[in-house]
Amino acid sequence: HPRLGAQAAMLDSRHDAPASQAAVSDPRPVPSPVPIGAQVTQLGIDVVCATVRAARWLVVVLTLATVLHGLGWGAMPRTSWAFLAVGLLVGWTPVGQIGLSVLVSRVCLRGLRPGTYPRAGRVHLSVWGCEKFAESIGATSMMSAPWMLNYARWLGASVGRGVDMHAVPPVTGMLTLGGGAAIEPEVDLSGHWVEGEEFHVGHVRVASHASIGARSILLPGASVGKGAVVSAGSAVHGLVPAGQVWAGSPASPSSARKVVGEWPDHRPVRARWWVAVYAVTGILLSFLPIIGFLPALWLLLRPSRDVDVLGSALPATLALTPLATIVGMLGFALVVLVVVRLCAIGVREGHHAVRSRVGWQIWITERTLDMARTLLFPIYASQLTPWWLRLLGADVGRGVEASTVLLLPCMTKIGDGAFLADDTLVASYDLRGGWMRVGRARVGKRAFLGNSGMAAAGRKVPKDGLVAVLSAAPHKSKSGTSWLGSPPVKLRRIATESVDERTYSPTPILRVYRGLVEVCRLVPVVCSVALGVLVAYAFVALAAFGLPAALLLGGVVVLGAGAIAAVVTSLAKWLIIRRIAVSEHPLWSAFVWLNELSDTFVEMLAGPWFAWAATGSPTITVWLRSLGARIGRGVWCETYWLPEADLVRLADGASVGRGCVVQTHLFHDRVMSLDTVTLGVGATLGPNSVVLPAARIGTGASVGPASLVLRGEDVPDGTRWVGNPIAPWDSDDHA
C-alpha cells in the first residue's frame, strides 16, 4: 500500500469506523499562531547574533587594515594589537568560539529537563537562541569540527573514550555517547523538535561501540544499545536493542542481519598525536577560501594603496568586484582541486583507521567538497558540473546532469546520461569501532538519484533505475528498477523512452543558450562580494568613532546588509522568472535555466547575508512572502528551502522544521513538473522531512521527523503520520 489512499482503503476494509482517521487521530486542539511577544523576542535574539557576527568580522577587517598600514597603506586605520589579539582568540579560534558558545548555553539552559514545552515559549526560544548564537560565533564551523568531542563534554554531555564524532552535539548537553561509539557526518543529535504548539526535548543515548549512519536523526528519548548499528538516513524513535542492525524511518530491524563489508574485530591503535593533526587541519581547512581568494583580495586592495582618504577608493574598488569575483572563484576552485587530488593518493577500498593517513585524507576530502559546493554553488547544476567532477577524480560519463552532489571522487562512477539531484550523497565513508570504511559507488547509465538520495559505499543505482527523494540505494538491484524510501522498497514506475533535444539530446544551439544563462550566475556572486566590500568600508568608518561604537553598531551594518541582500534577491526573482505556475518544462528549456539562475541569487546572496541566520525567525517568513509564498500569521519556519515559493501555502500557525524541503518540483525523465504544496492551519512538517508537489497536510495534522510525503497525497486533518514514506503514527507517542 504505497500511497495514502491505498492505506486508507485497507484500513477502512478492516474496521467499521473510518480507520484512516481513527487510527491516527490527534485529540489536541488546532495550534494557534506564534504569539507576537515571542516574535519580538526572536527579533531581539536576531540583533544579538548579528552583533556577534559583526564583531568577528570587524576584528578581521581591522587586523587587515592594521597590517596594511604598516606596509604603506597610509589611509588604513591602525588598531591596538592587544584588542585584535583578544578578538582573534575569542572569535576565530576553536577554544574561543566553543568556549563562548558553551558559556551562553550553560547560562541560558540551566535547569533544563527533558519534556514537552510550549512552542515559542521561554524554553523553546532559549534552545533556539543558543543554537543561533553557536552558529554566529562559529562554534559549528569547519574550524571547530575536530573539537566536537570537547564541545559535547563542555556542554554537559557524557562522552566515553575512543568516540568518533563527526556531527554537532546538542546545545542542551542531553547526550550520552558510550566508549567507542561512532557518529557519522550530518547526524542530527539535537534531541528536540516542534510539533504543533509543542516543543519536545529529550536525552539522546548511544551506547558503547554503537554506530549511527550519516544523515540519521535521533529523536528525544532515543537510545541505541551496545554494539548496535543504525544505517544511514534512519530515524530512531525509541530503543534500538544491543547488537542489532536497524534501518529506516522510523528505524526498525533490518533484513540485512549482517552489514555489507566485514569489519575488523579489533580496534586500531589510536595515536594521540592524530588529535592534534585533526585539530590543526580543521583550522587550515577553514583558511582554504582565504588562500584561494588572495589574488582577488589583492585586486580589491589596489585602489586604496595611494589614497589619502580611504572612502575615495570605494568606487574604484566596487568597479573591480566583477574581475575579483572571477579570480577568487577560480583561485578557490584551484585550491580545492589540489587538495582533493593530493588527498586521493593512496586511498583504496576497504577499512582504514580513522586516526591514520588515509582516514585523515578521506576526512579532508569530504569536508573540502562540502565547503566547495557552498562557495562554488554557481558551477553546480550546470554544464560545468560533469567537468568539475571529472577534474576532482570522479569517473563521469557523457550527458550527466548533477546538482549539489557530495561524493568521494576517487570512489565514484557515474554512467552516461545519469541525473543526480540536489544534496545527493555518493560513496561517503562509514564509521565503526575506530575504523573508516570506503568503497566504490556507482550511478548507472540514465539512472536517477533523487533529492537527498544516497548511494553508499558498495552500492549502486541501477542502469535506467531510480532512487527517489530522501531514499537510499539498496544493497542489490536490477537494471530498470526503481526504489523509494528508507529502507528502500521497489517502486512501480513507467519510464519514458523519449530522447528528444529537450531532454537527453540537446542541439548545439541549446547548449549555447544554456551556457549564456549560466554565465549570468556570476551576477549574484558579484553582488555578494560587492556587499562585502561595502560592509568592510562601513566597519572602518565606524571604527573612526571608537571601538565601542563599532562593536555596538556593527550589528546594524550586518542587518542592513542582510536586508539589502534579501531585497535584491526578491527583485531578481521577479525580474528573472516572474510568477511560477503549475506546469511542466523539459530540462533543456529557458524556464529551468532561469529558475536555476534565480536560485543562485538565493544561495549566494540571500543565503550568506540573510537566510542562513534568519531561519526560525519571523523575518524569514516576511522574505519568503516577498518571493511569492502565501504564508499566514505566526508561522514557525526553520527552512528557506521553498524552491518555487509561489507554489507554497503555509496557513496560520503552521510549523516547518529544520532541514525541511517544501519540494514544489520534481524531475521525471528530465522533465520538470511543478505543483503546489499546502500546509493547513496549525499543520506540522517535522525536521529533515520532504513534502513533494501536489501534496497537502491538513489542518492540525502532523508529519513527524525524517518523513516523506509523496506526490499528490492529502494528509487528513487532525491526524499524525511519520516515516519514509509516511504511515499512520500512534497518537500516544509524542516522542
What are these model-predicted stretches?
Residues 152-154, 158-253, 389-390, 395-489, ...:
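Structural signal for interior beta-strand "rungs" in well-ordered beta-sheet cores
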Residues 15-16, 22, 29, 162, ...:
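Positively charged, low-complexity intrinsically disordered regions
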Residues 1-24:
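Phosphopantetheine-dependent thiolation modules in NRPS/PKS and related acyl-activating systems
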Residues 19-156, 242-393, 479-628, 716-735:
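Terminal amphipathic alpha-helical/low-complexity segments used for targeting or macromolecular assembly
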